[in-house]
Structure formats: C-alpha cells, structure tokens
Amino acid sequence: MFTIITGAQFGDEGKGKIVDLLAKDYDIVARFQGGNNAGHTVRVGDEVYKLHLIPSGILLDARVLIGPGVVLNPEVLAEETAMFEKHGIKVDAEKLGVDAKTSIIMPYHIEMDGLREAARKTKIGTTKRGIGYAYIDKVARDEIRMAELVDKERFLKRLEELAPQKEKEIEAMGGDPKIVRDPFLIQKYLELGEQFASYVTDVSREINQALDEGKHVMAEAAQGTHLDVIHGTQKFVTSSSTIAGSACANLGVGPTRVGNVIAIVKAYITRVGEGPLPTELSGELGEKIQKAGGEFGTTTGRGRRCGWFDLPLLKKAIALNGYTEISLTKLDVLTGLEPLRICVGYKYKGEDLDYPPELTEDLWECSPVYEDLPGWETDLTEVKAYSELPENAQNYIKRLEELMKVPINYISVGPGREQTFKKE
C-alpha cells in the first residue's frame, strides 16, 4: 500500500504529528520534496523533536528515506542525526537512506539566496537557506548530487567545473565570490560526504521492491498545497511541487500504486511570510489564535498569520491532491471563540466565488463570505474520543465534512501523540 500525506493549506498544518502517529503501520516513510526550509515538530512525552529534513517516521520502526526531489543541506542532516543520537536514537544507514541523485545545497546557494532576497523590492518571504538556488541548479543540470558529495574525487572535479560561473554570479550580485572555493567549507563538505557515504541508496527501487512485497510505504510532503511552485499563490510559493502527484514523480513510483491520499488540515488557517490570506485576522483575535496555537515557525521562528477556515482554498487543495480522507488538527485552539466562522466563498469585484481565482493578484482582492457557527468553552486538550467532544465542536466537524465532501478520520486536540483520536 502506498499512502501520500500532504498539507492542504499553507504548511504548518501538523503533518509531522500525524505522520508520527500513523508511521507505526508503515515499513517505509519517504520525504519527496523541499529542503530544510520546512519544519515539522514531533512531541513524544516530554521530548520535543524539531525536524527539517529527516522524515517524521524516524521515531518509530519504519525505515526513512530522503528522495531525489529533495534538496539536502548535509550540515543540517548531520545536526539532526546528532540530535537523535543524543537522545539515544540511532540513525545509521539501516534506518535512513538518501537517494544518490538528491541535490546538495552548497554554501554558495545560501549566499546567493540571501543576496537575492535583500535586493528584492517586494519580499517573497524566503527562508534564505539556499533552497531556491539549489532547485535552479537542479533544473539547469548544474547541481552537485549526493553520489558526488560522498566521492571526494567526483566532488572536487564537479565543484571545479561549476566554480567559475558561480563566482561570477555572486560577484554580480554584490557578494564575495571566495565562498565558492573556500578551503574550510570544502573540507567540511568532504567530511560530511565521508560521514554519509553508507547512506546512499536508490529510493525508487527500494520503494517499488517494498510495494511488490506487500509492504506499506508512506510519502511525506513538506510545506502545503498552496505553496506549490506551479499551483500555489505565485510568487509567494516555495521552489518545489508540494502536491500528491509530486510524490509519484519525485520518488519514482507509478500513480497506479497509490492507495490513499491523506490531507492534513488545520481547524483554522495560517500562513508564515508574505502572500494573500483572505480570512486573515488582525488585532486581538488574530493574536489570541496565534498565542493559543503556538503559531511560530519551526524553521524561522516567525509568527504565523492566522485566519478563519477558508473553504474555497480547501476545495482547490482537494481538487489538486485527490484526497481520500482528512486529519483535522488544532481543534482545541478554537475553544472560547464565539462565533466560529467558516469562509464559504469570496466576493470579488461584485461577483460571488466559491473557488479561488487563478491569479494571486486577484486573490488579494477577494473578501471572505462567512457562515457562523456557535463555539464552545470546554477545554478539549484532555478529550480522548470523538464522543467526548462538546456538541458544538462535533457540529463544527460535521459541517466541515459536509462542505469539503471528504471524510475527516482523525482529530487532534493538542501537540502530544495521545491527543489525537479517530472519528468513530
């Protein structure tokens, strides 16, 4: 069975927690896009693990894989493996595999990313971690891959081939071109290559063999649907494709293998950085949700903008991903809010819309049309079953199901593993 999990909003929906919950039933969990610009948090008891590269299934028995559609900063990978080993969790080549064709984020990518964002008149909210420039090099066939990082001779040869052009580009951007051939940084990367040499694998082959043997494989996305490089709110998007179809393309798995596609949906909506957010709440109410939900980025620490549930954006996410079920997160954050509002459509230049306009500049001009529901005062964080939820919380969930036309199978009422239950 091949299952794909993606975020249905702008990222930060709680994918890490749900993947961690479900991974016990899977033999392999594979990350298929993005880099360390994305972050996911997994809480086990009193321990909190903040991850940027390693898939969330690392904490259970699953083998975890990083596919060739990911752009990988080996320094971050080393930091994460060290963090786990500090907590007594061994992350060796039997536990973690990285595809040979995975593109490597080089120091010059990070330098160029920062220079480009500083020069922009309109900021797009990049994390300045070199993700975009690593993807540019991948498309231009100018990347350094994992297979080259772990082979000293190949790595140095490839770097010499690329260095003159990279130095010219950095100098033209007003930066210091010496970073490209900095001996200290080169030595650091050679050591990282040596550290991870045994981790190199063929991810597509591993996954397809596992599926042939009847094993269960989960593909884990980073970020969210509306940050997709093609279908998202351009130009305020990430550099990779974040939707379910990308899992097949990037991991090398045929679409007929897909069994389930699970959406992770927050009970409200958030966005970090720039870009349109039609239901955004400014002032005291927005701050209240931000504080109650701990809405601060795992990667950047930036406060997330908060808004009411946006159905038109969800409809588009459902169309783009073909979801078979939904996991609803952070329901507890809505406690004490009266009324609860669901955006069921937009007003755009006098027209009524029930689906987002294609162009970002038009989405900026959309005003939300709300349906109001009564809220609840009960603290939900100790709730262990759907039947224990207050009536108005159940009614909110039922209404979302009616509107989305996709079943909600899991509900989360807090950050802990034990704070998620099935909707029976």
Swiss-Prot record:
Copy out the cofactor comment. Binds 1 Mg(2+) ion per subunit.
Cross-referenced CDD domains: AdSS
Q: Which UniProt keywords apply?
A: Cytoplasm, GTP-binding, Ligase, Magnesium, Metal-binding, Nucleotide-binding, Purine biosynthesis
Q: Name one GO molecular function term.
A: GTP binding
Name where it mostly resides: cytoplasm
What InterPro entries does this protein's entry cite? Adenylosuccin_syn_GTP-bd, Adenylosuccinate_synth_dom1, Adenylosuccinate_synth_dom2, Adenylosuccinate_synth_dom3, Adenylosuccinate_synthetase, P-loop_NTPase
Metabolic or biological pathway, per its Swiss-Prot or TrEMBL entry: Purine metabolism; AMP biosynthesis via de novo pathway; AMP from IMP: step 1/2
A Pfam match is: Adenylsucc_synt
Sites where the protein binds GTP? 11-17, 39-41, 304, 330-332, 412-414
Task: Output the superkingdom of the source species.
Answer: Archaea
Query: What cofactor does its activity depend on?
Result: Mg(2+)
* Catalytic residues in the record: D12 (proton acceptor), H40 (proton donor)
Q: Give the protein's biological function.
A: Plays an important role in the de novo pathway of purine nucleotide biosynthesis. Catalyzes the first committed step in the biosynthesis of AMP from IMP.
In terms of NCBIfam families, this protein maps to: PRK01117.1, purA
The name on file for this protein is Adenylosuccinate synthetase 2
**Which species expresses this protein natively?**
Methanosarcina acetivorans (strain ATCC 35395 / DSM 2834 / JCM 12185 / C2A)
The gene name on file is purA2
